Amino acid sequence: MICVDHLCYHYKGGRPILRDVSFELEDGRFLAVLGNNGVGKSTLLKCMNRILTADSGHCRIDGEDLLTLSHREIAKRVAFVAQHVPDTQMTVHDMVMLGRRPYMTWGVTEHDHHVVHEAMRYLNLEDMRGRFLNQLSGGERQKVMLARALAQEPTLLLLDEPTSNL
């Protein structure tokens, strides 16, 4: 279960962008946050994976406050696909493999390879595995980032305008 409890956030020198946001989301459920530009949708998602730290309030995953978890532990539980996709000279396979990084302590395992293969297969990226991201269209890069997020096997998947380039 995901619990956002009285979350507040403001940017330095700016007006409050999140004011007393609260909701609970049961496992297996979906939540869409809709609104105009600049109302805090992306900010909420960034607070939900501790890219940003809220001024007050709490985000909990299965009862554990994100503030008590290490960034590595958060990365195991929360995958975030940003609306802006990097344009990098990394292969599709290597970018998706980055999704497994929080689990890697002694190198890449057979399970890591299997999870990455399945994420790429699910999004029809197998034929692109050796191509570089900077050679792909915006939509193709967005699919790669989604595959990377799925390869994390997260408890919580946060998608910030995941189809803006598709």
Task: Identify the role of each PLM range.
Residues 1-4, 8-20, 27-32, 68-70:
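A short, flexible loop at the N-terminus of ABC-type nucleotide-binding domains that lies
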Residues 34-36:
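The feature captures the beta-strand-to-loop junction immediately N-terminal to the Walker
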Residues 49:
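Helix-to-loop junction immediately C-terminal to a conserved catalytic motif
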Residues 57-65, 74:
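Conserved ABC transporter NBD signature motif
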Residues 132-136, 140:
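Conserved ABC ATPase signature
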Residues 146:
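Hydrophobic anchor residue at the start of the ABC signature
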Residues 151-155:
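A short, proline-enriched helix->beta-strand linker immediately N-terminal to the Walker B motif
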Residues 157-161:
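Catalytic Walker B motif of ABC-type/P-loop ATPase nucleotide-binding domains
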